Design a protein with these regions (language model features):
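Glycoside hydrolase catalytic-domain context in secreted enzymes
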Residues: 1-221
């Protein structure tokens, strides 16, 4: 039923000219104070995994629909742990043990990558166990690509590359935030006004950045 529902969503969205959607939400939500619970599928790992997997297969037309131009790309979000922010507060820190991440939090995303072939993954707001998610190379490259073999693109959440500088204070400048996000594995910056917009000038001073930019462009194309 979920697959059929999202198949209709994918077809109708494509008819309206869309090519991708920032859905489904693969987070586990376990705090009733969290204001975005209605976007997720619940607190259970198995249920969320099945719902997310079938939602992606449906909206993408089991991936074949993208090539036929009948469906749109999915973006599973928010990688990782966003549904369990401290106090249920948006942008709050996330503290989850490694065992819980592997056994409970990661499986919906792993299924999205390996079984449903999601076109996109969105990084999480805030930080995970003290490391800013949008600068977390071990997570966005080590787990997602090296362990799971993900070949799609990673998109930032809204303005979160810029927030590495002006909100989280882990980058010394907007330019440094842009480089941090790019090196971590963020291919698309949503939005780029205060971060990736600096890349054309940055690459003139540091030609090595061109390799990272080319890598991200290939993933998107």
């Amino acid at each position: 039923l979920v697959r059929r529902q999202w198949d209709i969503v994918g077809r109708e969205a494509r008819l309206r000219g869309m090519h991708m959607c920032h859905s489904p939400e693969a987070d586990l939500v376990r705090d009733p104070r969290f204001g975005r619970m209605s976007e997720a599928f619940g607190e259970d790992t198995y249920l969320t995994t099945q719902m997310v997997k079938n939602a992606i297969i449906g909206v993408q037309g089991n991936y074949e629909g993208l090539g036929k131009g009948t469906h749109i790309g999915a973006v599973a979000k928010h990688f990782a742990g966003y549904g369990q922010v401290l106090g249920g507060s948006n942008f709050a820190a996330i503290e989850i043990s490694e065992r819980t991440l592997i056994d409970e939090v990661y499986p919906p995303f792993e299924a999205a990558v390996k079984e449903a072939k999601t076109l996109g993954i969105m990084a999480s707001h805030g930080d995970l166990n003290g490391i800013a998610s949008h600068g977390n190379q071990a997570l966005l490259t080590g787990v997602l690509r090296d362990q799971w073999g993900y070949e799609g693109y990673v998109v930032s959440d809204s303005n979160d590359i810029a927030r590495l500088f002006y909100f989280m204070n882990v980058a010394e400048s907007p330019e440094a935030a842009a480089q941090m996000g790019l090196e971590a594995g963020i291919d698309i910056d949503l939005y780029a006004e205060d971060s990736y917009s600096y890349l054309p000038e940055m690459v003139k001073k540091n030609p090595e950045l061109e390799k990272l930019i080319d890598r991200s462009v290939r993933r998107v194309l």
